[in-house]
Amino acid sequence: MIKGKKVGLRPVEKEDLLILRDWRNISEFRKNFREVRELSLADQEVWFNNLQKTKHINFMFTIIDLTTQKPIGAAGLLYINWIIRSADFSFYIGDKEKYIAHDNVSKEAVKLLIDYGFKNLNLHKIWMELYEYDSKKINFFINEFNFKKDALLRDNCFEDGRYWDSIIISLLNKK
């Protein structure tokens, strides 16, 4: 487990699938994910099995509250490209349906994963695709971690009867 003061990151385990499914099915969360359909436990199991087969490019973690030892969220470095040393950053706090919060728990979990990506995996870039209406997450990563806007993908999401842009943000490893 990658440990901080309040939270830790451990690889996703099969017993996490129920709570991960429940969190991902929260409608306010789901609209911010690329997978917009309601997920079943069978869907989660297929995802988990695929994750096991692609461990060399997908590092997915359950965020654990170190005091209670209970899962509070999920985070990952996904689709790692080992040639250009980049990874897609995935993150949410499911506990209390926070999604993301400008609190020490969210900040510590993100910092742990960024540090792991840069210091242990020797990544050069960590990036995210976020929908333009997800201002909470966009502002969190830009303001708290100095992510920069890289690109705009026009009309890349359909939600609430209209098209929305995607914003690509990233953080470079400035060794």
Model segments located where?
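A short, well-structured alpha-helix characteristic of acyl/acetyltransferase catalytic modules
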Residues: 1-45, 175
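Acetyl-CoA-dependent GNAT
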Residues: 42-98, 172
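Long, contiguous binding/interaction regions
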Residues: 121
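Short hydrophobic/aromatic beta-strand or adjacent loop that forms the aromatic wall/cage
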Residues: 58, 164-168
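Conserved catalytic-core motifs of GNAT/GCN5-like acyltransferases
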Residues: 127-130, 147-163
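Conserved active-site tyrosine of GNAT-family acetyltransferases
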Residues: 140-143, 169
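Beta-rich extracellular carbohydrate-active architectures
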Residues: 118, 146-147
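Conserved acetyl-CoA-binding loop-helix of GNAT-fold acetyltransferases
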Residues: 101-116, 139
